[in-house]
Amino acid sequence: MGGGGDSRIPQYLKTLFPPETLQVVIRTYDFDPETGRRQIASWVEEVRPHLVIGESLGAIQALRIQGVPHLFVSPSLGAPALLYKAAFLASFALGRWFLHRCYPVKEGDRQELKFTCEILRKYKAHGEAAIAAIEPDGYYYAFFGRQDHYRKSGVVRIDLWERYFGKSYTEYDGTHFMETEYIESLLVPRIREVLGLEK
């Protein structure tokens, strides 16, 4: 589940795994965390996934799915608190313009980022619910890019990850949007390991 609108990683995974080996499911959910949560819960019931991969802001929604192993790419654990604080900015037209300037919609994005005060206020409870959903015996593993520009702003925080999951992560020499070489060398082998797939 991608955050924002980027679907490059799941689309690339689809090309790497034949459908008879692994079905990669890509769905677009709402930026409103409550609406998105209801959509995702319905899809989980329908698809019955064996693995959930959360990217960026999508990591927060992924954490709320229980009973399956989790992998994460650039999990944005610091985002809910920052988005909640940004709700005040979203009360003003200039503030909404600023937020869209900071997080622009790119061509091909699947998810519309709706920076309204009402929606952003929901992210505090959304983040708290995600942490509360962590299972003591669950499987959680993450990948962080050393050149991830969101680490400077506190959106992506390895210290927060370590607080809840310890050292269950790998850093790679790339950006927030995992490059294909690291998808192939790091993410794919971990997927195979978790699902018990042969090479």
Where in the sequence are the language-model features?
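The alpha/beta-hydrolase serine catalytic core
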Residues: 69-71, 75-198
